[in-house]
Amino acid sequence: MRKQIEIFTDGSCLGNPGVGGIGVVLRYKQHEKTLSKGYFQTTNNRMELRAVIEALNLLKEPCEIILHSDSQYMKNGITQWIFNWKKNNWRASTGKPVKNQDLWIALDSAIQPHTIHWRWVKGHSGHRENEMCDELAKQGAENPTLEDTGYRQD
C-alpha cells in the first residue's frame, strides 16, 4: 500500500518579476516537514510551479498524495491544459509557445510515479498550512540564494 502524503505549496514573488520564493509543508501521519527556498529573478507563476516540483522531488517512493495549492494556474495547467499543450508541441491555443514550458515539463515528469488528488485552497483566508507556506515562500524571497534556471523575460 502506498504512503498517504498531504502536501501544501505556495509561491511568492516580490515584484513579479523579481525575487521569489517557495514554501512547502509535507505531512505524513503525524510528521511535518517544511521547505523554503529563494530565487533571484523570477515570477509568481514560476514559483507556484517550482514549489510543487520541489515538494514532489522530496518523495523517495510512489505515494498517494493530496496536494493543496492556492494557484489556479498550476492546478488548471496540470489537470486540464497540459494535455493539449503536449499534443500541440508545447504551443498554447494562441499558437505561441507555452510560458514556463521548462517547469511544466518538469512537473509532468515529477507527478508520474504518484497518484495525486489536486485541491485548490483560497489564499490568505486563514487556512493554517497555506498560511505557513505563504510565510515560508516570503522568507525564501527575502533571502534568495538560487538562480531560477529557465526563466526568461518575454
UniProtKB/Swiss-Prot annotation:
| Keyword terms | Cytoplasm, Endonuclease, Hydrolase, Magnesium, Metal-binding, Nuclease
Q: Which reaction does it catalyse?
A: Endonucleolytic cleavage to 5'-phosphomonoester
In this chain, Mg(2+) 1 is annotated as bound at 10, 48, 70
The record's subcellular location field reads: Cytoplasm
Sites where the protein binds Mg(2+) 2 = 10, 134
Q: In Gene Ontology terms, what is a biological process of this protein? A: DNA replication, removal of RNA primer
What is the required cofactor set for this protein?
Answer: Mg(2+)
Which top EC class is given?
Answer: hydrolase
Database matches in Pfam families? RNase_H
InterPro entries hit by this protein: RNase_H, RNaseH-like_sf, RNaseH_domain, RNaseH_sf, RNaseHI
Record's GO cellular component, any one? cytoplasm
RNase H type-1 domain spans which residues? 1-142
Q: How is the cofactor bound?
A: Binds 1 Mg(2+) ion per subunit. May bind a second metal ion at a regulatory site, or after substrate binding.
One GO MF term on file is: magnesium ion binding
**Oligomeric and partner information:** Monomer.
Q: Give a short account of what the protein does.
A: Endonuclease that specifically degrades the RNA of RNA-DNA hybrids.
- What family does the Swiss-Prot or TrEMBL record give for this protein? Belongs to the RNase H family.
Q: Would you tell me the protein name for this molecule? A: Ribonuclease H
**Organism this protein belongs to:** Actinobacillus succinogenes (strain ATCC 55618 / DSM 22257 / CCUG 43843 / 130Z)
